[in-house]
Amino acid sequence: MLETLYQEALKRKKEPKEGSYTSYLYDKGLDKILKKVGEEATEVVIAAKNADKNEMANETADLLYHLAVALVETGVSLEEVETVLQARQGKQSRIHDRPEIDHY
């Protein structure tokens, strides 16, 4: 499904269509696209905090769509993302807590 989203976003970039929301986003440019990515990411966080599975699924779908548009706009392919994910698979993470901030 992610590939389908990406291919549809790519097609709309190459073949703009009157009245298309995707074409509208491309016309407005990267800043508008990234604003939507940020908004949708925030809505995913809220849905998760609300423990609303339906809202979570819907907002995640919106986020994935806007990420696909952002990838196309910035010239990053899904294959490039997959390569990064595959390279990370099985690697040990360097997770650690950040030091407390005591000077403001």
Curated annotation (Swiss-Prot):
UniProt keyword list: Amino-acid biosynthesis, ATP-binding, Cytoplasm, Histidine biosynthesis, Hydrolase, Nucleotide-binding
Subcellular location: Cytoplasm
Database matches in InterPro entries: HisE (IPR008179), PRib-ATP_PPHydrolase-like (IPR021130)
Reaction(s) the record says it catalyses: 1-(5-phospho-beta-D-ribosyl)-ATP + H2O = 1-(5-phospho-beta-D-ribosyl)-5'-AMP + diphosphate + H(+)
Record keyword Thylakoid present: no
Lineage: Bacteria, Bacillati, Bacillota, Bacilli, Lactobacillales
Stated family: Belongs to the PRA-PH family.
The protein's name: Phosphoribosyl-ATP pyrophosphatase
Gene label: hisE
Provenance organism: Streptococcus sanguinis (strain SK36)
Annotated GO biological process: L-histidine biosynthetic process
Entry EC number(s): 3.6.1.31
GO molecular function: ATP binding; phosphoribosyl-ATP diphosphatase activity
CDD domains reported for this sequence: NTP-PPase_HisIE_like (cd11534)
Keyword Transferase: no
